[in-house]
Amino acid sequence: MKTAIINIGQIVSGNIQATLTAGDAILREGENLTKVGQISEKDIEDSDVIIDAGGAVAIPGLIDSHVHITFGDFTPRQNTVGYLQSYLNGGVTTSISASEVHVPGRPKDPDGVKALAVAAKKCFENYRPGGMRVHAGSLILEPGMTIADYQDVLSKGVWLAKAGFGAVKSASDYIPMVSEAKKAGLFTTLHTGGASIPGSFPITGEDLININPHVSFHINGGPVSMEDKYFEIVARDTEIAMQVCTAGNLRTTILCAEMARKHDAFERFLIATDTPTGSGIMPLGLIYTISQIASLADFDVPALIAAATGNVAKCYGLNSGFLKAGCDADVVLIDAPLGGTQNDALAALKNGDPCAIGRNNCRRAKICWQE
């Protein structure tokens, strides 16, 4: 199927190096984008579906890189069904598991956590809630695991690994585990900051640097932040991606963004939610964090959208997150909210307001079926 989106007000690329794309149209064929910016009259005539954006802003589908997936569209943490479809209505077209740690009675032995990760991965290969793409199955690192265990899950399709909730005695125990997981080819993430569940312990800034994962999860606190001085050290002296989350400390979120920009490390700055957790379920979490940073600090909205799209895709090696030819056709239309003081979505977000999102309340876009 071919779909044309026309009369777009602005196109946000998802690329932190060039955040806006000139033009007013996007063409999709099958599951991929084929043209972004300019399309021909023939492209429009040949399309099966034509969407008139009516001046709305097009952005890449948002990627939430910190979602505590379990099984199905259900979270036992808040006993809620349908939360992933709600996130889709909030513009999130891709969710990435932050480990299936909330599964009731979840195993803590190597064989058990391996089986859990593989089962989650396999289930979501066959299930897309509301159409959302879910990268599930994040291996929880537990004592006794070896490089053979990491290679075993990799051979079954699992590529994510999470440190921070295992039954280790101290944070330093994760240093060799994360190192071996990385050598095996797993993409490693680390709980950062204060303890978030009973029986766990804090991961300090010094621990983070020593463990050296690919991504520091909720570096701004999950929900309690690490010491301020480490934000500059991580941005300046490491290659660790700095993920800030809605369910964390807003002050250190802005501090992290400022340090990332200061040290030319903004490509490693990621925006996520860290939900569902005790902090709740946040379908608009990414939108709120973008608007909060933009309105309280000197950051452009398109750059912050990139932190929740293209930056994440580049970090995790995904084919989504960018509005460019060849990428997954994940497109979200956003607009100024009804009753707001601003005239377009980007200005609304800069003003600290949430934006209207395409499928449920974008006031200008409409679908025209081509005969």
For the regions a language model picked out, list residue spans one by one.
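Short, acidic/polar
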Residues: 77-84, 142-153, 198-207
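C-terminal cap of metal-dependent C-N hydrolases
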Residues: 328-371
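His/Asp/Glu-enriched, well-ordered alpha-helical/loop segment
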Residues: 258-337
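Active-site core of metal-dependent hydrolases
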Residues: 159-280, 297
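Divalent metal-dependent hydrolysis catalytic cores, especially in the metallo-beta-lactamase
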Residues: 83-112, 124-141, 155-168, 186-189, ...
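Glycine-centered positions in the ABC transporter ATPase nucleotide-binding domain
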Residues: 9, 31, 55, 360-365
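N-terminal metal-binding scaffold of metallo-dependent hydrolase/deaminase domains
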Residues: 1-44
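Metal-associated gating/positioning segment near the N- to mid-region
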Residues: 52-118
